[in-house]
Design a protein with these regions (language model features):
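Alpha-helical transmembrane segments and their membrane-interface exit regions
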Residues: 77-80, 125-135
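Membrane-interfacial segments at transmembrane helix termini in multi-pass membrane proteins
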Residues: 131-150
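Membrane-helix interface "capping/anchor" motifs
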Residues: 31-36, 85-97
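Alpha-helical transmembrane-segment detector that highlights a single hydrophobic TM helix
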Residues: 62-85, 89
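Hydrophobic transmembrane alpha-helices of secondary-active transporters
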Residues: 20-28, 78-86, 107-108
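Interfacial segments of multi-pass membrane proteins
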Residues: 29, 98-115
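Hydrophobic alpha-helical membrane segments of integral membrane proteins
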Residues: 94-99, 117-122
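Alpha-helical transmembrane segments and their membrane-interface boundaries
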Residues: 1-69, 113-121, 136, 150-158
Length: 158
């Protein structure tokens, strides 16, 4: 049976919420000039939301069906996020961006399945972690670099 106008409106609202909850995370990654940003994050969220809504629209969805939807989603988003991870000679970068892509996919699915409260928490915690823990991470890395320059192996060699 085709969806009603009311159902289409509700679906549009859900996808808009998923999009909006991903924007702050995408903005943060874009501002930091990361490989994924303002376009990627909302697209992942809205696609994940749409997939969850499609899965919920089956005549008699079972727990097993929901499980398979989530398994496929997590695998696919992991592949997308893996593209953000770069390995150089002695460093790895992009792990926070990759984890954020994965988180935004789950956020979108949460909205699609109707778990708004989970989506809001995922969005807020992800954004705050990126926004406020990044300066601490930089300070820790500077401490390690200073210790190496002094000839020690760690900051604890003092």
């Amino acid at each position: 049976m085709p969806p009603t106008i009311e159902q289409i409106g509700q679906d549009m609202i859900r996808m808009s919420i998923a999009y909006a909850l991903a924007l702050p995370i995408g903005w943060n990654r874009e501002r930091e000039a990361r490989s994924a940003g303002l376009r990627t994050f909302p697209i992942v969220a809205i696609a994940s939301c749409g997939l969850a809504m499609l899965g919920s629209s089956f005549a008699n969805p079972t727990a097993d069906a929901y499980s398979r939807i989530l398994q496929g989603l997590v695998t696919g988003i992991g592949f997308v996020g893996g593209g953000a991870i770069l390995r150089a000679k002695h460093s790895v970068s992009g792990t926070a961006t990759a984890a954020s892509v994965w988180n935004v996919g789950i956020l979108g699915a949460a909205v699609g399945f109707g778990y708004w409260h989970i989506a809001v928490v995922l969005s807020v915690v992800n954004f705050l972690t990126l926004q406020y823990l990044t300066p601490f991470k930089r300070e820790i890395h500077l401490g390690f670099e200073r210790a190496k320059e002094r000839g020690g192996d760690s900051m604890l060699d003092d």
